[in-house]
Amino acid sequence: MSKPVKAAVFGTGSWGTAFGTVLADAGCEVTLWGRRAALADAVNSTRTNPDYLPGVELPENLRATTDAAEAARDADFTVLAVPSQTLRAGLADWTPLLAPGTVLVSLMKGVELGSAMRMSEVIGDVAKVGAERIAVVTGPNLAREIAARMPAAAVVACPDETVAQRLQAACHTPYFRPYTNTDVVGCELGGAVKNVIGLAVGIADGMGLGDNAKGSLITRGLAETTRLGVALGADPLTFSGLAGLGDLVATCSSPLSRNHTFGTNLGKGMTLEETNAVTKQTAEGVKSCESVLDLARRHGVDMPITETVVAIVHEGKSPVVAVKELMSRSAKPERR
């Protein structure tokens, strides 16, 4: 009888806990790592994560610890589920503890500020491992629905198809259906940019601009995501799949989406400070909109919706003025 797959999940937020639950339900032995002893104790004693997934029962083969070395020991997969802008510092601490040969799995959907690196690039840069040992999980995966064992599909991406298949097997359950892909660039960009477009759609919803505006933003948002991806060498077909359109639709249409909710509050007239105060978890698009725009400018890619989000979120531009400016841009063919 083969030994069970071991997985370490660094991050006890909603998505880290939800994906840890998927891995455990698929038969893995899962250890969650988090900084707060009280939360780790609650996971182990009550079988719930009261801070991020209250009311969701966690599997018996999932446990939590504050000891990073204990979590990382002998892990076949080391899953990274922390805010994207904190990854570099955290991984620098964890790298000496990693099990030999472990596959590093990114759940994060962002682009690093300053370097404009995708998360897999940050992982490779810090941990000094090859791309064949770095995988990405992405798609329309709202954490609370996954944790409630509601049906969902996802993409597991790695340049090495065999590694992608191993991860696929490790997280395949009756309610979670993963597909493999070798286009890591496209899969990561789809996840990072959809957070920005989710903010834009949320702002439009908060302003009461209607469903035509929402449909237009989603579609043109997908177009600028694809332009950026192609400029970076991604397969354009990736953006019509789960990592692109699938994730974008879920983020832009669900009240469970942090980015959509954040944008809605801004569109209703709340300040950035007020919106931050009522948001308990990270809305990745708030910081990633700047790094996505930086990445686009480095490659000469026009991303007007992303530019508009940056202007509203970080430059204090009125949403009303920003929408007027976006709508008054020079006319052009759709396929450009």
UniProtKB/Swiss-Prot annotation:
Q: Which residues bind NADPH?
A: S14, W15, R35, R36, K109, A143, R258, E284
Chief subcellular site? cytoplasm
| Pfam families assigned to the protein according to its UniProt record, in alphabetical order | NAD_Gly3P_dh_C, NAD_Gly3P_dh_N
List keywords of the entry alphabetically: Cytoplasm, Lipid biosynthesis, Lipid metabolism, NAD, NADP, Nucleotide-binding, Oxidoreductase, Phospholipid biosynthesis, Phospholipid metabolism
Q: Please state the Enzyme Commission number of this protein.
A: 1.1.1.94
Q: Where does this protein act, in terms of pathway?
A: Membrane lipid metabolism; glycerophospholipid metabolism
What residues does sn-glycerol 3-phosphate bind to? K109, G139, K194, D247, S257, R258, N259
Which InterPro entries does this one have?
A: 6-PGluconate_DH-like_C_sf (IPR008927), 6PGD_dom2 (IPR013328), G3P_DH_NAD-dep (IPR006168), G3P_DH_NAD-dep_C (IPR006109), G3P_DH_NAD-dep_N (IPR011128), NAD(P)-bd_dom_sf (IPR036291)
Where found, per UniProt? Cytoplasm
* Functional description taken from the UniProt entry: Catalyzes the reduction of the glycolytic intermediate dihydroxyacetone phosphate (DHAP) to sn-glycerol 3-phosphate (G3P), the key precursor for phospholipid synthesis.
Family per similarity comment: Belongs to the NAD-dependent glycerol-3-phosphate dehydrogenase family.
Entry protein name? Glycerol-3-phosphate dehydrogenase [NAD(P)+]
Please report the organism this UniProt entry assigns to the protein: Streptomyces coelicolor (strain ATCC BAA-471 / A3(2) / M145)
Which taxonomic lineage does the organism of this UniProt entry have? Bacteria, Bacillati, Actinomycetota, Actinomycetes, Kitasatosporales
* Primary gene name: gpsA
